[in-house]
Design a protein with these regions (language model features):
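Hinge/lid segment of periplasmic solute-binding proteins
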Residues: 28-43, 49-50, 95-98, 122-181, ...
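Glycine-centered hinge/linker elements that transmit conformational signals in sensory
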Residues: 216-221, 249-252, 256-297
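Conserved N-terminal structural module of periplasmic/extracytoplasmic solute-binding proteins
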Residues: 2-14, 20-131, 366, 382-389, ...
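Periplasmic solute-binding protein
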Residues: 129-132, 138, 155-202, 239-264, ...
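Short, solvent-exposed loop/beta-turn-alpha elements that line the ligand-binding surface or hinge
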Residues: 138-153, 205-207, 235, 255-278, ...
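Extracytoplasmic/periplasmic substrate-recognition and gating elements
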Residues: 166, 327-393
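Acidic, glycine-anchored loop motifs typical of Ca2+
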Residues: 208, 225-234
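Short helix-initiation/N-cap motifs at beta->coil->alpha
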Residues: 94-103, 208-214, 295-309
């Protein structure tokens, strides 16, 4: 499953990671960047990732090229900054998703980093930091890592996560660029055939009424026996992936699996909180209400994908990157955030981000200044209309103007802290919730000891 996820990220990440779509400014102006560090001249910078290449010396520079005006202007800008400042820079696929953590760690330990800058998952970066393998980027004054940066938007959620004893070890530009936010995709045709407005989720979301009560009402309307033979022909959703389904309601109730103690910074098991138990109860209730298509006997693990893609179920709950999987669906579709539960006042973007890190070995402080300056310059937005690059990705503008606008808003962000705990699998709850013979609180209690042990171990690393 994780390999398939990585494949879709390959197709999408170049558009949003290091592409400047989360824009703040108008036309890029070299003067906004300030004077380039002297150490930049003659430097060759490789931004190592696990999905695809971007090389400005090639035409097209990447396999994900569509020739849009935005892409053309980005390419022109990136060629210009290299030419004017005497350096070279490229994004390079240096490893597979499975290989990247080891290649990053071993190459840095050996003093021969496989890349100048690594783009890695947050949990990988945390492991690298705890091994002393990351450069404290906050020691550099080449770019402003605060909200005062007027050239690019620095992700403050990531800054806070990777700041230890007043030093910061990882950063990201913009919000939502890793496409990991939990969302609900919905089939407009099935809404219409059930007598519902095909834009109903958008309308409810916009009006602040996209909540569990409305969601359940809609699910019941979407689950239909269309030919009166006693067998349901369409369902609101599938019973898989149960982990993604539970994520939706945990997020929607402003809860989480693992939280951070505001005073100590330690990770804390949050599955026993009232908000989490309430989310688990609601997920189980949906299954018992009969609005979820059960897994067919003998079906593959990913059976749920064609059920939505082929119009058998009306909604699919997953991370945002799945929009590539449904790009060629015959039916039109939309995308909204998780509906609000009783404990939530606002919509929540439950997400994590890939992060950018610089190795602790192999570069002088002057070179780090130059590298950071170049990364910022590479990511200067070429189009002040952040929507421009997104409209072609979706079937309607409301997904961009409304849902994506909320995904980009820092105040809606909630980081998936559970990914920072090695060996912790939320499936130990989600995989069991349809079949557990007992109360939701008892299911949580049955795994609490192992969860607490793993969280304690993570805090001691």
């Amino acid at each position: 499953m994780l390999k398939n996820k990585a494949m879709w990220i390959v197709c999408l990440a170049l558009v949003f990671m290091l592409a400047g779509v989360m824009s703040l400014s108008a036309q890029p102006n070299p003067r906004d960047l300030g004077r380039a560090p002297n150490a930049l001249r003659g430097l060759n910078i490789v931004v190592g990732n696990y999905w695809a290449d971007y090389d400005t010396t090639k035409n097209p520079p990447t396999a994900q090229w569509n020739g849009s005006e935005s892409q053309e202007r980005t390419l022109e800008w990136r060629r210009r900054i290299q030419r004017d400042n005497g350096f070279t820079m490229q994004e390079k696929n240096i490893a597979s998703w499975n290989e990247m953590p080891q290649i990053a760690a071993t190459s840095i330990m050996a003093g021969r980093p496989a890349a100048t800058v690594f783009v890695v998952q947050a949990d990988w970066a945390m492991s690298l930091q705890k091994q002393g393998l990351l450069y404290p980027i906050s020691d550099s004054r080449a770019i402003d890592f605060t909200t005062k940066n007027k050239v690019v938007e620095i992700n403050q959620m990531i800054n806070q996560l990777f700041t230890f004893q007043r030093k910061t070890y990882a950063f990201q530009i913009g919000y939502g660029g890793s496409l990991h936010g939990q969302v609900i995709f919905f089939n407009k045709r099935l809404f219409r055939e059930a007598g519902l407005d095909p834009d109903l989720p958008y309308d409810l979301q916009k009006n602040g009424r996209w909540n569990w009560d409305e969601f359940l009402r809609i699910c019941k309307a979407l689950t239909r026996d269309t030919n009166n033979d006693g067998i349901m022909d369409t369902y609101a959703m599938t019973a898989d992936l149960s982990t993604e389904i539970l994520d939706i309601f945990v997020a929607g109730n402003n809860s989480e699996y693992v939280s951070k103690d505001a005073r100590t910074g330690k990770l804390v098991n949050s599955t026993g909180t009232p908000a989490f138990i309430e989310a688990l109860q609601f997920a189980i209730r949906l299954q018992r209400e009969g609005v979820m298509m059960p897994k067919p006997d003998g079906a593959a693990w990913d059976w749920y994908k064609p059920m939505f893609n082929d119009g058998r179920v009306a909604m699919r709950m997953e991370q945002e990157y799945v929009r590539q999987d449904i790009a060629n669906m015959r039916d039109d579709w939309g995308m909204v955030l998780p509906p609000k539960g009783p404990k939530a006042r606002d919509y929540v973007v439950f997400t994590d981000e890939n992060v950018l890190v610089i190795p602790s070995k192999g570069f002088t402080p002057q070179q780090v200044d130059a590298i950071l300056w170049a990364v910022q310059a590479w990511n200067v937005p070429v189009d002040p209309r952040w929507q421009t690059a997104l409209y072609p990705v979706f079937r309607d503008q409301r997904a961009v103007n409304e849902t994506m606008a909320m995904i980009r808003d820092p105040k809606n962000q909630k980081f998936k802290n559970h990914i920072l705990v090695p060996g912790l699998n939320r499936g130990s709850i989600a995989w069991e919730m349809w079949w557990f013979d007992g109360e939701p609180a008892q299911l949580v209690e049955s795994v609490s000891s192992s969860w607490n042990t793993r969280i304690e171990d993570a805090n001691e690393l």
